[in-house]
Amino acid sequence: MGATSGIGRAVAEIYLRNGHQVGVCGRRTERLEEIKNKFPDNSHIATVDVTSNESISAFSRLIEEMGGMDLYIHCSGYGRQTENLDADTEMQTAATNVMGFTRFVGSAYRYFVANSRHGHIAFISSIAGTKGLGASPSYSASKRYQWIYAEALEQMARMRGHHIRLTDIRPGFVDTDFLGHGHYPLMLDVESVARSIVHAIATSKRVAVIDWRYKLLCFFWRMIPTSVWVRMPVHS
């Protein structure tokens, strides 16, 4: 999901090059057609908007067309800096990263349960969930939501004996359209990040922070008391 550009597309193309049957979903039909033309034998496409309830039916049809699903990867995301707490930005972020995330991750979980399949759900969250970021309030809060939702699903799976694994991918700044290819500290290359994601999924990591520099950063972030953090002039 969210595989028409950036990290999602890079990850999808790794699996496609390796010969896997891959269902590729996203909002931009023309980008989906590009992928289909590039990998005609093992790509299956569906135009899906995670903010729409109606898109669930397209997602379900795609799974049926493929003959089932073993791994679901959720890469859809939205976020912008909002100095003046722009209402449209905040609500669109929540609609995509909270409602859309819940809609499709939940749908994948229910699919695995209903079909008695051993399933794996992976998703791209962010190190932004580590602390509340004044430059992007809704974005950082939505990423923390994703962390906790996955934790709850993992507990549910264990309680009820569902064979479903979860992998939470937490990258830092990645050079993609999402950031407008701007200049940010510790910028990561999208292809390198995609390879790290595929490795994390293959090794069933529960949480994967990409890369070591961001692991170190998050370690120190967590040590900062909230009373100190809220006084710090942190910018995304």
Language-model segment annotations:
Residues 168, 180-222:
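C-terminal helical subdomain
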Residues 73-81:
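Conserved NAD(P)H cofactor-binding loop of Rossmann-fold oxidoreductase domains
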Residues 39-54:
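Rossmann-fold cofactor-recognition segment
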